[in-house]
Amino acid sequence: FWQLTNSPKGVSNFAPYFHPSEKFIIFSSNLHAPNSFNFELYKIDIDGKNLQRITYSNGFNSFAMFSEDGKKLIWTSNRNGKTRRDFNIFVADFLEIQSSN
């Protein structure tokens, strides 16, 4: 086994899920807002490179999974909720954007 993330103090990474291609995973993190409960979805290659933020909702986004063909992403979020504890399930087309490195 190997470690993919090495986050600073106050950052939590959890709920990883493999893309069907097994080239990368999606997971939930508060990397952008350490010590907060603001969790967004991130994507990282299996070698630990190319970290990319996927969601931007200033709330809680987690428990992401892909459809078998990898074209749909499903996750839990409190976006559009009346309170921070109102969670719903969201589905979106997953479009992989190549980095310009």
What do the PLM-derived regions correspond to, one by one?
Residues 1-101:
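Sequence signature of WD/YWTD-type beta-propeller architectures
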